[in-house]
Amino acid sequence: MRRARRWIPAMAVLLIAAGCSSTADGDAVADATSSGAAATTTSAPTPWDPCTIPDEAIERAGLNVDTKESGVFGRDQNGFKICGWESRPPSSKYYVRVFVGFETLDFVDDPSYFNRLQPVRVGTRDATQYQQLAADAALNCGVAFVAGAELIRATIITGTQVGNPPYDPCTELNTVVAALDSELPT
């Protein structure tokens, strides 16, 4: 009985090694019959990428295609795909960013981040105009609307070198977004 107990662990190791290899020499490699249940992974859906808006549409909207930036400092944030452009020279007075993510309009109804919500019409869409809490309403504005399962947000940030902009930021943003309307998801 003692002798059998000594060999049981050795036999178990041999059986495991034999089941993991399809060849007699070399390193053990697991084959399909020994791996048990197959693991399936599904990647999370990815929001529509606003950087795919054609350059011609960006130019028609008054933005500079040469200033396109994917993400914020190159990174998407909080599940949103992000793309931004400066206004066209010589003014280069503001920066527009488009954010797309799997959220609802409730996202901008968060009083800890956004305020001054009001309904607006932007192009063919019913939207919600908003301000970020820390933003100067004389220089910045945001607008949001839903397209299918995605929330599309756009923001305008006026450059700090522009003291008193010759435009209303919300009116300017709505004009830019309306010009891009046909390129955005529906």
Ranges and model annotations:
Residues 1-10:
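Bacterial N-terminal signal peptides that target proteins for export
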Residues 15-19:
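C-terminal motif of bacterial Sec signal peptides marking the signal peptidase cleavage site
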